């Protein structure tokens, strides 16, 4: 397994797919990286030369990926919660942040249902 940005990427897959195992690199970014490095997308990781791997590592090193990106995202969320804006309040309460309805759905954000006891008449 080749190691890029602290992540072991699978050897038997195509390079463009293997790069997506790194947090912060999706398919479009992987394609741009390979184009800049001058590596074909169809190449398997096991067939890469050390020189090609070095070029890919250098390009990925310039991007914000893995731990740095995770830290930035969590700090952004923490900042929103501290300044008390609407999005921060939604994060604090564990509700959807982007305006989705919460009457019926939003179970992923709200967690499992908590049944409320009915008042007897």
From Swiss-Prot:
InterPro entries under this entry?
A: Rbsml_uS13_C (IPR027437), Ribosomal_uS13 (IPR001892), Ribosomal_uS13-like_H2TH (IPR010979), Ribosomal_uS13_bac-type (IPR019980), Ribosomal_uS13_CS (IPR018269)
- Region labeled Disordered — which residues? 94-121
Q: Which GO terms of type biological process are on file? A: translation
Biased composition of type Basic residues is found at: 106-121
Q: Which GO terms describe its cellular component?
A: cytosol; small ribosomal subunit
For the keyword Ribonucleoprotein, the answer is yes
Q: Spell out the Pfam families in the cross-references.
A: Ribosomal_S13
Q: Name one GO molecular function term.
A: rRNA binding
What family is it from? Answer: Belongs to the universal ribosomal protein uS13 family.
Function text: Located at the top of the head of the 30S subunit, it contacts several helices of the 16S rRNA. In the 70S ribosome it contacts the 23S rRNA (bridge B1a) and protein L5 of the 50S subunit (bridge B1b), connecting the 2 subunits; these bridges are implicated in subunit movement. Contacts the tRNAs in the A and P-sites.
Q: Provide the assembly information.
A: Part of the 30S ribosomal subunit. Forms a loose heterodimer with protein S19. Forms two bridges to the 50S subunit in the 70S ribosome.
Q: What NCBIfam families does this protein's entry cite?
A: uS13_bact (TIGR03631)
The record, for HAMAP family, names: Ribosomal_uS13 (MF_01315)
What's the protein name? Small ribosomal subunit protein uS13
| Organism placement in taxonomy | Bacteria, Bacillati, Bacillota, Bacilli, Bacillales
């Amino acid at each position: 397994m080749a190691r890029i940005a602290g992540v072991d990427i699978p050897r038997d897959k195509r390079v463009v797919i293997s790069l997506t195992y790194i947090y912060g690199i999706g398919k479009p970014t992987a394609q741009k990286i390979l184009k800049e490095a001058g590596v074909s997308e169809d190449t398997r990781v096991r067939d890469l030369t050390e020189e090609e791997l070095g070029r890919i590592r250098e390009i990925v090193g310039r991007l914000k990926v893995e731990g740095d990106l995770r830290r930035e995202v969590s700090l952004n969320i923490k900042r929103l919660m501290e300044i008390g804006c609407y999005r921060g309040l939604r994060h604090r309460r564990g509700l959807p942040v982007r305006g989705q309805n919460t009457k019926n759905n939003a179970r992923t954000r709200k967690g499992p249902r908590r049944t409320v006891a009915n008042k007897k008449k």
